[in-house]
Amino acid sequence: MFLSMNWISDFVDFTGLDKVELIHRFSLSTAEVENEILFKGSDLSGVVVAEIMSVENHPDSKKLHLLKVDAGDGQLTDVVCGAPNVRVGLKTAFAKVGAKIGELEITPRKLAGYTSNGMCCSEKEIGISEDNSGIMEITDDFANGTDIKEAYQIDDIIFE
């Protein structure tokens, strides 16, 4: 059985306990924590909520778009994106330069003659679901620049 620490913390206050003490107490009072602890979201950093402010079709590609995104840092960032669902006003998950998604570190990259200074992400790329049909579509509830782990509560420890 897998249990989310975020879910358990809705019922129990863990303030001041480190992971080792928490595992010990959980094993004594509830159930043994078996083989491993999975750190959901631990391989994700620098990914934030961003809003697409402009979209232009790439002059030499039918699939690529040239975007300007607002990642909440006071400037617009140029991004090259091939997702079919890009549109002005869409809020999405955005990996800034320096962000890490698993083993991938985001760097400025030249794509079809244009520099992309980040990456708009699908749900699959950030580990929320297997959906890779387009970039994430996020509600307007979150301010630009909000850490995606905070917005989607994916910074979690899963006990087995």
Which role fits each region the language model picked out?
Residues 1-160:
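Phosphate-backbone binding interfaces of nucleic-acid-interacting proteins
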